[in-house]
Design a protein with these regions (language model features):
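Solvent-exposed interaction patches of small proteins and small membrane subunits
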Residues: 1-115
């Protein structure tokens, strides 16, 4: 049974909030040299990609309102299947540049659905 679209948006928002909290006040060198930190960030990105991938199955029209949806899901797949080649700088850059905007959009969609 498929979940309510709000549940997927909630999962994505919560994972984004966690990442933003994890990297607050941390520089790239500290991030890259702290396995616990980059493991946690990568896991939360996996959750975002999976949640939004499931959202695209449950409510494709809602999912289309999220820019770069394909890239988000593809990034999740890289983290899951290409784990040996993950570049900390790439993950860091996405967390710093793309994630805040994604978090805003997901929160707005969730709010619009009464969540």
């Amino acid at each position: 049974m498929l979940r309510d679209p709000r549940a997927y948006l909630w999962d994505a928002r919560e994972a984004a909030d966690a990442i933003l909290g994890f990297v607050a006040g941390v520089d790239l060198d500290s991030y890259a040299s702290t396995p616990l930190l980059h493991s946690a960030v990568e896991r939360k990105f996996e959750i975002i990609g999976e949640a939004l991938g499931q959202l695209s199955k449950v409510d494709p029209s809602l999912a289309q309102r999220i820019p770069d949806m394909r890239d988000i899901i593809a990034f999740r797949n890289v983290l899951i299947h290409g784990y040996a080649g993950i570049q900390h700088r790439r993950v860091w850059d996405i967390a710093q540049s793309s994630l805040p905007g994604l978090r805003t959009i997901v929160a707005e969609l969730l709010e619009g659905l009464g969540g």
